[in-house]
Regions:
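Hydrophobic membrane-insertion alpha-helices, especially the h-region
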Residues: 16-35
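Glycine- and Gly-Pro-enriched alpha-helical subdomains that act as flexible
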Residues: 251, 271-304
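C-terminal, low-ordered peptide segments at domain boundaries
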Residues: 192-247
Length: 335
């Protein structure tokens, strides 16, 4: 029985080996990806569907997030990127620090998203002269360098160093500066909602005492509007901060600043309203034009590129420069 089955398999392979080889090669071509992504023009995401709150004021127009379509770097996609003018081949290393893996990149992006959403609330409520409450401002591990000797991970919230409470990077630094190279320090942290102890060995680099981590404060705020953000599990990053702040502001003030227009844009935002640059503005602008947006808002450091793309491609869209949140509101008022 076994011999007959073996003979059948062998004969089938002999008769169909060319097809089998072709099939395997075909599957590999479209499934095996390299350390590249292909950036292509993206689209719009209406923030009415992303930010939910109580007692919203009505709006005739819309504020929209813009995004870049990133395709996996399979061989056919890589080859097409050399043929299609609006497609660009980008190394994944461009968004990677040292040797971090995809999960670490995503965790950093989630930290950015949480932080910028809170910044958007604060910037909007400050401009509208409305109250909000800072519930948390966690000292969070944003990155762990390869040179470190610690069991801390990205996303850990540090509450104490050697049993001394810390609230920000300066307080953390002051404690580390009392140590010497080779000392081991103990961290009290929160990871996955559980309090635990971790350690790190101090080392010296360029005259500074280091643990080998990058820290950031992540704020969470609450308001009487019960604001909720709706994002999928693989969405992350801070580039939607400005547009989120505009959406929130428009929902909490009587005057409709959209004026019935489809307004798209991009840019990070700080809690004090400063707008920061982003990557991929030409793909975001192309997506906005493709989806018939009336206005595109670009951060100052991306503004010239956006204007250049508009002129080069003869785009029919109004482009606004974004320096600060307050200035963007004034520019929208002047439309």
């Amino acid at each position: 029985m076994t011999n007959k089955l073996y003979e059948k398999i062998k004969n089938f392979i002999k008769a169909n080996y060319k097809f089998i080889i072709f099939y395997i090669v075909f599957i590999l071509l479209f499934t095996v990806s390299f350390d590249y992504e292909i950036y292509t023009p993206g689209g719009l995401s209406n923030l009415d569907d992303r930010i939910i709150m109580d007692d919203e004021y009505p709006s005739k127009g819309t504020f929209n997030l813009t995004y870049v379509n990133a395709k996996k770097g399979t061989l056919p996609m890589i080859l097409l990127s050399y043929i299609i003018p609006s497609w660009d081949l980008v190394s994944i290393d461009d968004s990677r620090i040292e040797n971090e893996d995809y999960d670490e990149i995503l965790k950093r992006g989630k930290i950015d998203l949480t932080s910028v959403n809170s910044n958007a609330i604060v910037a909007a409520f400050n401009e509208a002269n409305l109250d909000y409450k800072v519930d948390k401002n966690d000292l969070t591990v944003y990155y762990v360098f390869d040179s470190s000797h610690t069991n801390l991970k990205v996303g850990d919230i540090i509450t104490k160093v050697d049993n001394v409470s810390v609230n920000n990077a300066d307080e953390f630094r002051n404690i580390i500066n009392t140590k010497k190279s080779g000392d081991t320090v103990e961290f009290t942290i929160i990871r996955n909602n559980k309090t635990m102890k971790k350690t790190g060995e101090i080392y010296e680099s360029d005259g500074s005492l280091l643990v080998g981590i990058y820290l950031t404060n992540v704020m969470e705020v609450s308001t009487d509007k019960n604001i909720k953000f709706k994002y999928s599990g693989n969405e992350s990053g801070s580039s939607g901060g400005l547009m989120s702040a505009l959406e929130i502001y428009n929902n909490i003030t009587k005057h409709d600043i959209t004026k019935g227009l489809t307004i798209a844009g991009t840019g990070t935002i700080s809690s004090t309203g400063e707008v920061g640059e982003i990557a991929g503005v030409k793909y975001k602008l192309a997506g906005a034009v493709k989806n018939k947006a009336d206005v595109f808002i670009a951060p100052t450091n991306n503004y010239k590129e956006a204007l250049s793309e508009k002129e080069k491609n003869n785009y029919d869209i109004k482009i606004i420069e974004a320096k600060t949140f307050k200035q963007v509101l004034e520019s929208l008022e002047d439309l």
